[in-house]
């Protein structure tokens, strides 16, 4: 079986990044990559044409098409297709924010939404949490906190910088997700959710390897599903996304007061400028920022 799709240059590079984890084959003339993934061979050409061949060619190609549940803009892969009617299940969902921001914490939240609470959560209007303004999320978060079982892991910069030499950012994410999920499971016990949905940032096997390598005593693994854009598939992830964002914003506000200057979110030029100003004032960045980011060196060069 053969399937061919056409992608833009950015998507082609993303695909090359994703497939770099698989066994490579001899790259044909005019191609950027050629790999074997399960029962499919995938070859991406500089022209933007990507050819899928083999028994699972159609399924592999579907991961990269807009109408697919799979979203692999980064090297991520769903463990399995979500079950039918998943949106109406009782689900414990988790999400994190702050991994790509220089200033502030890495914040992870987990929220349990039972079937009987689904309508209440829908009424909050959070189905697409990524489109909500910060002010709107700040109004919704207290209601989620008061009504739904939840837990938040807020890894502030100083602790983050202590852990970073030992764990890469994805491993820190995995540890935080696992810990938050475990805490919520303890809170709702003896109730067991029908499923756990993690907003995906790593391949399933890689996620669990992160936890094993970190020697986590308790690893949550039963009925766990992974998908990117998880907030689109269950309200529990949308609720978790909102909690994580609001806690991050609160932490950023407090850090800004301590620093005596508004700390911007993100990792752009404004961040470099503010970091340089803190250095001029003799302020230690480790309390405010994730030091391994390239922004640290950029700020130093601005002095």
UniProtKB/Swiss-Prot annotation:
GO terms for cellular component: cytoplasm; ribonuclease H2 complex. Its EC number is 3.1.26.4. A divalent metal cation binds at residues 95-96, 199. It comes from the Bacteria. Keywords: Cytoplasm, Endonuclease, Hydrolase, Magnesium, Metal-binding, Nuclease. Residues 89-303 form the RNase H type-2 domain. NCBIfam families: rnhC. This is Ribonuclease HIII. It comes from Leuconostoc mesenteroides subsp. mesenteroides (strain ATCC 8293 / DSM 20343 / BCRC 11652 / CCM 1803 / JCM 6124 / NCDO 523 / NBRC 100496 / NCIMB 8023 / NCTC 12954 / NRRL B-1118 / 37Y). The lineage of its organism: Bacteria, Bacillati, Bacillota, Bacilli, Lactobacillales.
């Amino acid at each position: 079986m053969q399937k061919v799709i056409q992608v833009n240059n950015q998507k082609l590079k993303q695909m090359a990044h994703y497939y770099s984890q698989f066994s490579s084959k001899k790259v044909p003339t005019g191609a950027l990559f050629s790999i074997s993934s399960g029962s499919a061979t995938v070859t991406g050409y500089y022209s933007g044409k990507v050819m899928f061949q083999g028994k699972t060619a159609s399924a592999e190609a579907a991961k990269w098409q807009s109408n697919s549940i799979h979203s692999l803009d980064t090297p991520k892969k769903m463990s399995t297709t979500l079950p039918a009617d998943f949106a109406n299940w009782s689900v414990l969902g988790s999400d994190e924010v702050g991994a790509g921001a220089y200033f502030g914490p890495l914040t992870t939240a987990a929220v349990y939404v039972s079937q009987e609470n689904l309508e209440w959560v829908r009424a909050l209007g959070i189905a697409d949490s990524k489109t909500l303004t910060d002010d709107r999320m700040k109004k919704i978060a207290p209601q989620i906190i008061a009504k739904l079982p939840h837990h938040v892991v807020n890894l502030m910069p100083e602790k983050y910088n202590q852990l970073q030499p030992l764990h890469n950012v994805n491993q820190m994410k995995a540890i935080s997700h696992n810990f938050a999920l475990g805490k919520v499971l303890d809170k709702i016990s003896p109730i067991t959710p029908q499923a756990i949905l993690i907003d995906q940032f790593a391949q399933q096997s890689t996620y669990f390897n992160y936890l094993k390598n970190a020697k986590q005593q308790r690893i949550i693994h039963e009925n766990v599903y992974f998908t990117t854009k998880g907030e689109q598939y269950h309200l529990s992830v949308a609720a978790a996304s909102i909690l994580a964002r609001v806690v991050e914003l609160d932490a950023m506000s407090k850090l800004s007061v301590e620093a005596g200057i508004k700390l911007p979110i993100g990792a752009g030029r404004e961040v470099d400028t503010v970091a340089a100003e803190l250095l001029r004032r003799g302020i230690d960045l480790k309390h405010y920022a994730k030091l391994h980011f390239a922004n640290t060196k950029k700020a130093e060069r601005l002095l």
